């Protein structure tokens, strides 16, 4: 029989209609001789009623055999419920069954198919096809589909061209580790799965495409966390002949449309703009969460004369004030915060409490002479907790930024109904890597330096600024972009500043440098992390909730057991040997 409609879409206007439904048995209940079944499909749940006085004995026998997650086909008449269930969209109606057949049976599932299950993550991923049956998960992917549909409509209307770029490409340095794919035809050579379509989309601008976009898979072999996966999806854009402001305007319009189409929200345009240095100094993060206050305060000048060497001899002394929560933090609680501070490179965490117009705490005796200035500078009020870090500017900012976010979550200071977008601009071109002992690209080596600082490519690299911009949402980097280098000499200077010899630059990026000999237009773009965006729209804290078949924290798939060993024959065909199969 042909399905008439989705079970979750049956409403009171269908009363008296004969329909056929197909789906899964959510649960079965036997009450007073009647059998009640919750039939579930992707749109929701519909109650079925089987009355032994109104159906054939075979139908009743089939109903009695049903168990959770059996797949069934059922026909009957929609009737009004005697008692409506206000918790269900279908709660005013039920289906009086006339015909019933089993399309497939099911073993007992390892967890219940319902929201709010307590199964651990690996069990959910091992049986991902069952996990995805849960209404909550289905809603996540409906939302994701709405987001991509909205984005495509918006960009199509602006005459962007959707172009697929290669999945098998060249391995290049800078950034995360590549996933490598050995070539059978070209023995000893390897492709790389793209970390982004960065260079190919730039080449499309040189080809005259003018406006490109792609919703594209990318791959990075990096350590995983809640908002990272080894394979992820980007909304990738590139344009020619536009300024950074014009590109940002396009992106803002796209996000505004997505918010309207998916959440019914009007977002205020233009988005706020914040300089990178201000973000770091005030929020301790290059992706500031502006849904709550607790800004970092610089106290270096105030404390430099105190008789406390930890403060007086430090490069900087900065603090955050936790308003009206001093009584919530015992010494044990503060010790936990101190351990977190040490994880970010701080030597420790000094603290004070301000109660009844008096400071108290381990360092209070050193600060009595400046208590008035401190109280005024920090605008202290009763029951405030003050946390200090005395260290380099970078360590103080990063440590207090991390504590600021953790404390806000602990104390429930964040308004989760808000969607606070902003641009972080005026980025440094380079960042120093202690591990590498050299400057690295803060974004990537194709970013255009500002005209005012480009001369420092041969001088002080710390002074070079980039025409770069990150879009931030609620403390997460949603995406990043920049204007790109289109002049060959500037690109060669950039490679040299990053430590490339002329030979290595030619070996790695010769095709790009050659393209710059052929009228490369001014261009720029941006990429937005689709998984992260949908995660935030769905109110989740892990992108696994919005990726159909994600990897776990070991970059493995418990369902398919990927990655897996391969046969000796496959290795021989690729001229590869593996030293050990041991984990």
Swiss-Prot record:
Annotated spans, Aspartate: 198-201
Top-level taxonomic group: Bacteria
Localization of this protein: Cytoplasm
GO biological-process terms attached to the record: aspartyl-tRNA aminoacylation
Residues given in the record as ATP binding sites: 220-222, 229, 477, 529-532
Annotated InterPro entries: Aa-tRNA-synt_II (IPR004364), aa-tRNA-synth_II (IPR006195), aa-tRNA-synth_II/BPL/LPL (IPR045864), Asp-tRNA-ligase_1 (IPR004524), Asp-tRNA-ligase_1_N (IPR047089), Asp/Asn-tRNA-synth_IIb (IPR002312), AspRS_core (IPR047090), GAD-like_sf (IPR004115)
The keyword Cytoplasm appears for this protein: yes
Reactions accelerated catalytically: tRNA(Asp) + L-aspartate + ATP = L-aspartyl-tRNA(Asp) + AMP + diphosphate
Major localisation: cytoplasm
EC number(s) from the headed UniProt entry: 6.1.1.12
NCBIfam families: aspS_bact, PRK00476.1
HAMAP family referenced in this protein's UniProt entry, alphabetically: Asp_tRNA_synth_type1 (MF_00044)
Task of the protein: Catalyzes the attachment of L-aspartate to tRNA(Asp) in a two-step reaction: L-aspartate is first activated by ATP to form Asp-AMP and then transferred to the acceptor end of tRNA(Asp).
UniProt similarity note: Belongs to the class-II aminoacyl-tRNA synthetase family. Type 1 subfamily.
Complex formation: Homodimer.
Name this polypeptide is given: Aspartate--tRNA ligase
Organism whose genome encodes this protein: Streptococcus agalactiae serotype III (strain NEM316)
